């Protein structure tokens, strides 16, 4: 997998995260912390866990000491979504900066997560794992928000692509789509 592809996927995750946090910020503290009988964690727990996993996996893959990436973010530090937003923006900046340092050859190298372990994969497997975990958790958060009447709306990849097109931007390294392209429109079927 190429770095520019991973940067696009992480751009999508951060766009999705922003939609989810924007809705979560409209909740009262009690709503944000309300127990969930639907998912493994409540909304706050889901979002803090998501940030924690992104941050700790990045630190681990960067070779930081175990005491840095092993500790968990305390839920009590994030009583509201607003408290979480600033931390996540800083982490997003750090993640994007780290991704920018990885070239395609580095991503293809086998990464020995635990020396001596049989589980050895290219670095891009682990980076993609961070992205897919975030997608799953943000999907859970979106379900919880929807049940609280604060739906983030459609947060699928093509919605992100349409957003970029409307903004006149595109993921780094991707050619602009020619004006004569076929338009699928908003009648796409969601899966």
Locate the predicted segments by residue.
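Conserved small/polar residues in nucleotide/adenosyl-binding loops
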Residues: 190-191
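Acidic catalytic patch
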Residues: 101-116
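Short, contiguous alpha-helical
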Residues: 7-22, 26-74, 114-177
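A late-sequence structural motif
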Residues: 178-184
């Amino acid at each position: 997998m190429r770095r520019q592809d991973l940067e696009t996927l992480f751009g999508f995750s951060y766009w999705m995260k922003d939609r989810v946090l924007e809705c979560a910020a409209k909740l009262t503290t009690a709503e944000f912390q309300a127990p969930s009988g639907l998912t493994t964690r409540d909304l706050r727990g889901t979002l803090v866990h998501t940030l924690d996993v992104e941050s700790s996996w990045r630190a681990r893959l960067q070779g930081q000491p175990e005491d840095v990436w092993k500790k968990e973010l305390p839920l009590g530090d994030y009583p509201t979504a607003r408290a979480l937003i600033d931390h996540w923006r800083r982490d997003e900046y750090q993640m994007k900066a780290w991704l920018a340092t990885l070239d395609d050859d580095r991503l293809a190298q086998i990464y020995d997560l635990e020396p001596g372990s049989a589980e050895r994969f290219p670095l891009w497997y682990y980076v993609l794992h961070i992205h897919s975990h975030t997608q799953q958790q943000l999907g859970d958060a979106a379900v919880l928000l929807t049940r609280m009447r604060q739906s983030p709306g459609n947060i699928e990849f093509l919605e992100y692509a349409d957003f970029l097109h409307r903004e006149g931007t595109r993921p780094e390294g991707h050619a602009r789509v020619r004006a004569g392209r076929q338009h699928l429109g908003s009648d796409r079927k969601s899966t």
